[in-house]
Curated annotation (Swiss-Prot):
Gene label: Lrrc42
Region (Disordered): 374-406
Domain of life: Eukaryota
SUPFAM superfamilies: RNI-like
Record's protein name: Leucine-rich repeat-containing protein 42
Organism: Rattus norvegicus (Rat)
Modified residues (Phosphoserine): S399
Amino acid sequence: MAYYLNSEAHLDPGPIYVRENGQLHMVSLALDGVKNSLQKPRPFRLFPKGFSVELCMNREDDTAQKEKTDHFIFTYTREGNLRYSAKSLFSLVLGFISDNVDHIDSLIGFPEQIAEKLFSAAEARQKFTEPGAGLRALQKFTEAYGSLVLCSLCLRNRYLVVAEKLEEIKSFRELTRLDLSCCWLGDEHELLEHLTNEALSSVTQLHLKDNCLSDAGIRKMTAPVRVLKRGLENLTLLDLSCNPEITDAGIGYLFSFRKLNCLDISGTGLKDIKAVKDKLRTHIGLVHSKVPLKEFDHSNCKTEGWADQIVLQWERVSVEAVRQRKDPEPRKAAQYFYQKRALTEASRKCPLAETHMNSSGKLQFYREKAPDCHEPLLSQESKKSKKRAFEESEQEQSSPQSAKQKCVCLAVEDWDLLNSY
């Protein structure tokens, strides 16, 4: 006991109480003589002298460290002191849901304002770039909010995004503008067939410039509109330029687009251009434009909606994946075989489009505005000639030969194509 009291490391524990025979006694009073012989006790310290605080971070486990500090917001005061405050409960819940956004059952009926914040939080965490989980999460939003997620999609020259994120692109609904120029789709591409689905019946502007399309692709794209009266029935603008495999026969499939106001068929494989102009004017009222139309300069078609930044993330991921390929020789050999240029950081231009625009004039068509009611009336002779022409056309339509022609207008390939829907 004496050794303990005389120890230099002794720290005063304070008063000590002992209960004896039902009475409480202070032991320190009995040790007054001993205390007097000792040196003055040192003041009680919570930490020894020289104690310092050091902020240590375990860099090996960033996730665990993030979970510990994610509940606080660190700010600096005017004096330069670090101050932290707790996040709101809404922010904590929003962060937790965005980390597990792919496990949400449904967002139908959820407020749009909260859903937009949830979408932005998941986008900041790059949840939509994850394979599998990103697609499931994106489908939940597109099913509930449609055009709010994306109303306009521009994939011009982004053939890598189309190849890598095809299912994600197909999940978008209620698009009004879609630009797939210079994506090398071809007639048998899955995305071309997806254009005829009911989910994209809202598309009014479609750009398919330089996509290796032919008459077969145009026939497939217009089959639902021609027979079932569904699909791209609301289309008002169509760009089919720089597809040299489209001939005069393929243009005939476009007559089913009754709402079409602008059409670009420059650089196609037309032989009788004058006959095509007359047919377009007669069937759907489109007139050849002598000057380039501003609707086809691609300045108005942009990616708009909540997911506009996600498309950029997809592009960065796709380009990075191509750069990280360890064995580029097979790809270079394939590019040499197909006479394609090597990938560069800059977006790919359409050399085919430039050659066609330089070699021949543009074939762009537009719908003339209806004449104003204040314009002078037509003469009686012009009225009679129009009436006579209309009666002759009615007689031709009512004849049995014309009825037979209507029945035979669909080929066997068309019926096979329609049966596949």
